[in-house]
Amino acid sequence: MEIKKNYYVITALVNPEKVVDFNLFQWSLLICQARRAGVLARIGYILETQQLLAKVPKEALKQIKSAEIYAQHVHRSLDWELQGLQRAFDSIGLPLVLLKGSLYVVANNRTAIGRVFSDIDLLVPEINLKQVERALNIEGWKAG
């Protein structure tokens, strides 16, 4: 039997009640897929809200709790990064427009719970790109 890409992650997100019947091998695949997709903590949140955490094997629960701690760290780090971004944008009189993950966190959207991301997506008018790059450089960011 061929397992579709991210089958276990999709199952956990769409039908979380099904994961309680997973064996340890399936849990291992779910954890690997979820970590790669940055949604393991999100799955933990879903399992908690569905009152299914008590049915999760302790080996998997440790991984979920670790992912939740890391996601909380990412969200705290975002606050610090946003302060610098806001200073940069204020210095040139442009609004700071966030997209995707960071926007969900700032908006306190439920979608942000357990979400992990490695960058901050911004919307900048093309005409202002050079100006924004200079302001970000002054605040300590360097072009990658």
Where are the model-predicted features located?
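Helical scaffold of the NTase/Pol beta-like nucleotidyltransferase catalytic core
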Residues: I3-K5, L13-K100
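Generic alpha-helical propensity signal that fires on short helical segments
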Residues: L40, E48, P57, A112-V116, ...
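Active-site nucleotide-donor binding segment shared across nucleotidyl transfer reactions
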Residues: Q83-N137, A143-G144
